[in-house]
UniProtKB/Swiss-Prot annotation:
The lineage of its organism: Bacteria, Pseudomonadati, Pseudomonadota, Betaproteobacteria, Neisseriales. This is Small ribosomal subunit protein uS10. InterPro entries: Ribosomal_uS10, Ribosomal_uS10_CS, Ribosomal_uS10_dom, Ribosomal_uS10_dom_sf. It comes from Laribacter hongkongensis (strain HLHK9). Pfam families: Ribosomal_S10. The keyword Ribosomal protein applies. The gene is rpsJ.
Length: 103
């Protein structure tokens, strides 16, 4: 697996959870001897929703809700077979979405 790169993209609503997961991935990859670049914080996606408070009148009275999606990007340069096995066995929290691409 020489001259290859693994790109890992993490997505979560809770930034504490995503930072902890990113640190676990970095520690695991460094323990197996791989070079890690990142985690790079990507821009947070914010979705806002306005909802009417009243079911009938009072259009000017609204509640506002938002969902923040935090993103992190990491590259693992020249991963070994040990690195791939260790990353596959890694147990991450349920609130973190992981996308892995081999380049």
């Amino acid at each position: 697996m020489q001259n290859q790169k693994i790109r890992i993209r993490l997505k979560a609503f809770d930034y504490h959870l995503i930072d902890r997961s990113a640190q676990e991935i970095v520690d695991t990859a460094k323990r197996t001897g791989a070079v890690v670049k990142g985690p790079v914080p990507l821009p947070t996606k914010i979705e806002r929703f306005d909802i009417l408070r009243s079911p009938h009148v009072n259009k000017t009275s609204r509640d506002q809700f938002e969902i923040r999606t935090h993103l992190r990007l990491m590259d693992i340069i020249d991963p070994t077979d040990k690195t791939v096995d260790a990353l596959m066995k890694l147990d991450l929290p349920a609130g973190v979405d992981v996308e892995i691409k081999l380049q």
